[in-house]
Regions:
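Single conserved hydrophobic/aromatic residue that forms the stacking wall/gate
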Residues: 1-12
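Flexible beta-alpha connector loops of hexameric P-loop NTPases
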Residues: 35-40
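Short, conserved loop/helix-junction motifs that constitute active-site signature segments
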Residues: 20-23, 53-61, 80-83, 199-201
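Active-site-adjacent loops and short helices of periplasmic peptidoglycan-processing enzymes
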Residues: 46
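Nucleotide phosphate-binding/pyrophosphate-handling subdomain across enzymes
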Residues: 105, 115-203
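Conserved helix/coil segment N-terminal to the catalytic DExD/H
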Residues: 13-20
Length: 203
């Protein structure tokens, strides 16, 4: 939320009806799971609702970002071609941005990635590879919005977890960690547990 009319750039999370009336220059497709079928009823209906963001709200010749090899790649490429969007992918060595290595140092991670074939790194305390992937989405979106890479790297390390999203809220005397996440569907719970086990294999 902001009342500052001087704001030139803003990053917001897509949500039903929240974006009506906006024109977007850059849009990200992070994933599609079975979390909201109570509202959308069918997986196809859910996908079509998500694609409204790219079909109607994303400006022609705007930027579209998604992960290389996702099952919705065909639909996104079709929209990109129709609207003459600039497509940027995250994932493999041929992608615009690519995660190369996650180096674990106690509770901290050193994230090594390449952008336009040039190597960079930053620190993060976020839990799980899914959050690291989301950080790379944020890095790329900021870069495409004209933010200098030095500024991005200086600030991305300060990003804290969203409340209730793989959030460490405590540490016990036996060094066990208390991690809070509001996942409540089978897909979401599976993702959360697998991401926790990535960082803490004994959990």
């Amino acid at each position: 939320h902001t009342n500052d009319r001087r704001q030139r750039q803003m990053c917001i999370r897509d949500r039903q009806h929240r974006l009506d009336g906006l024109n977007l220059k850059t849009a990200l497709f992070t994933n599609l799971t079975r979390d909201h079928l109570d509202y959308h009823k069918t997986f196809k209906d859910y996908l079509n609702s998500k694609l409204i963001l790219f079909n109607k709200l994303l400006l022609n010749k705007g930027n579209i970002i998604f992960e290389n090899g996702i099952s919705q790649e065909k639909e996104l490429n079709n929209i990109s071609k129709k609207k003459k969007l600039k497509t940027y992918k995250i994932g493999n060595e041929n992608s615009f941005i690519n995660l190369k290595k996650i180096q674990k140092i106690n509770d901290k991670k050193r994230i090594h990635f390449s952008l336009l074939k040039k190597d960079y790194s930053f620190n993060s305390y976020l839990i799980g590879s899914i959050q690291i992937k989301n950080l790379l989405f944020a890095v790329l979106a900021a870069y495409l919005s004209g933010v200098k890479i030095d500024t991005i790297l200086r600030n991305i390390s300060k990003v804290k977890p969203v409340n209730g999203r793989l959030e460490q809220i405590g540490k016990l005397k036996n060094k066990s960690r208390v991690i809070l996440d509001y996942a409540h569907t089978p897909d979401a719970l599976k993702t959360v547990i697998s991401n926790i086990k990535e960082d803490y294999p004994l959990s």
